[in-house]
Amino acid sequence: MGPVPELPEVENARQVVEHALHRSIVEVDDRDTYECRPHQPGDIAAVLVGGRLTAARRRGKAMWCETQSADGSTGPTLGLHLGMAGRIIVTGAHGSNESAYGGDPHVGERETDKPEWTRFSITFDDGGRLRLFDKRRLGRVRLEPDIDALGPDAAEITRDELRSRVGGSTAPLKARLLDQAVLAGVGNLLADEVLWQASMSPSRRANTLTTGELDKLRVVLRRCIRSATEHGGVHTGEVIGSRRKDATCPRCGAPMARGTVGGRTTWWCSREQA
């Protein structure tokens, strides 16, 4: 199994969705009752056809579109969740070779041509389409998704928010980073990358970090997110290739250690993150 889409992959997908904005919707295929649950076939189409997507938003790993209805009024929000390995594909006008891809970086363009793995699609009046390609069928499309339970976006969290939300708990540091109600968007690989770059133990109690250490953690977190977004995903991180048996730390050469923290498989430098 490849890495699950985390904040950087979802941000790349959100940027792809921007290619679909302000194009008139003429058809919606929402027949996949599992991917589009709890809606029935035709429910999503009924409110989107004739309208437009007007904005693409994201908080953490949650992504949604604002819409305009056929009569020009504000429409419902449309949630697009990538699941474990989903990908967004947006094609240009009919006859154009322009396509944009975002989401799971391990899905090849050849695979995305398989129509049976397109779980949801929107067709525009210019002949282009937006598709949710999801081989494993673990994504989700729904109207008015609930994002209120999510914490602040990990790429935008303020210094004071991180100090109180992450530092105010006796839980292991990695567990706090993974808690989407604390801050939204950090998954297993990104957490390991951030803690390795910050030289912090994943199992250290979060409330033992000093204010200076928490501020450093925020700087490193933002830097890792920015780098992963620019380079195509969390899998491009500096330590990710060393999350394996018999690997050594890319920085100091010490053996990489493996364990379970916060219920997730975790790798860290046995010397610098002890």
Residue ranges and their predicted role:
Residues 1-274:
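Structured catalytic/nucleic-acid-binding cores of DNA maintenance enzymes
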